[in-house]
Amino acid sequence: MSTTIAQAFVKQFEREVHEAYQRMGSKLRNTVRSKNNVQGASTVFQKVGKGAASTKSRHGAVPVMNLDHTPVECALYDFYAGDWVDRLDELKTNIDERQIIANAGAYALGRKTDELLIAELNKSVNYAGSAADGLTKAKILAAFEMMGEADVPDDGQRYAVVGWKQWSQLLGIEEFASSDYVGTDELPWRGTQAKRWLGTLWLPHSGLTLNGGVRLCHWYHKTAVGHAAGADVKTDITWHGDRAAHFVNNMMSQGAALIDTTGVVTLRCLEG
């Protein structure tokens, strides 16, 4: 078995890991504001306040809205996902085996992305209902009202992420699961990836925080949370003679930030 690694193979494998990460590594990255190719250890997301329109006199100056621009800093950290591969030569010729290893690295980095975003969502203190029951219709409507009263845009960019227990409870709500209310195209029974309801894309996630039997679910607008990434996923493959194996290390720099607290409503759901 050769212990030398062609740079062309490393680049190909690196590209496959990055494409897998972009395609399916993270479930939440596409639901938030994203910045790519960030240079340095941090970046800034702008939180823009509300503006007001007003009249002007003839030949007078156009009034300025004086929007509040608040910078929100997002720190980036380096994350690594590595594993030992005994037979690297097989990865060079066996596409299926190579894809399995590439996906494993991409999924690990994607789970870290979701973990960072969930940690920021958990900072929300805008609670709908209590933590003494599950995901009920009343709790959902209370959160819906909170979003509206906070002037969170109803522009198709609202997202709700819930646990699998809560997803099962949603299926018990007729307005969510019946074609009489949502039409045949939006029936959740046709697939469990995601479903649009109340102008929001609902999706189940296994990584939401569970504290004392209470699952923290979140309903938010895309502009309320941000994710930043440095350079694309990088891959390093090195031979270790003492282990007679190659070490495949995938790495990327990323971070997350809660930009606007008013754009997030948290639903605390009891799991029995």
Give, region by region, the residue ranges found by the protein language model.
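N-terminal "assembly arms/tails" that initiate or stabilize quaternary assembly
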Residues: 1-74, 264, 268-271
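Extended, solvent-exposed, turn-rich assembly/linker loops in the middle of proteins
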Residues: 123-193
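Short, surface-exposed beta-edge/turn micro-motifs
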Residues: 41-42, 155-159, 245
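Short acidic, glycine/tyrosine-flanked loop/strand segments centered on an H-E-D-like triad
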Residues: 69-91
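Extended, compositionally biased alpha-helical segments that mediate assembly or anchoring
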Residues: 237-272
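Short helix/loop capping segments that flank catalytic or ligand/cofactor-binding pockets
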Residues: 53-56, 169-172, 257-259
